[in-house]
Amino acid sequence: MDEKPLVWLGSSLRELRAFPEVARRRAGFELSLVQQGLLPSDWKPMPDVGAGVVEIRIHTGTEHRVFYVARFEEAVYVLHAFEKKTQKTARLDLELASSRLTELNRNRKDKRKGDRT
């Protein structure tokens, strides 16, 4: 299987680059597994964000999360990366990832329409 490219939506790459080095390296490793069609080491489905969205859970003394969707053939889309500061994921983080997924779905739909004309 070919490795899927990563597509960073919104400010997700900048968000991940702001992680401490250990968390950033772990996130990179986990995303490389996903690119190869494998599951990350510690993950959880996030149906409240949208269909097919998965949360990578990174534990390095502080908690970091990366939301992605890999259900599309062409790429792994990274929706959001953030430091988790409370037990429950903040509504703002869930809404941001959800809005980026909505935009992704809209752009993919528009592209398919353009390909048919």
Give the positions of each predicted feature.
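Basic, Lys/Arg-enriched alpha-helical interface segments
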Residues: 1-63, 72-76, 83-117
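Short, surface-exposed charged micro-motifs
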Residues: 67
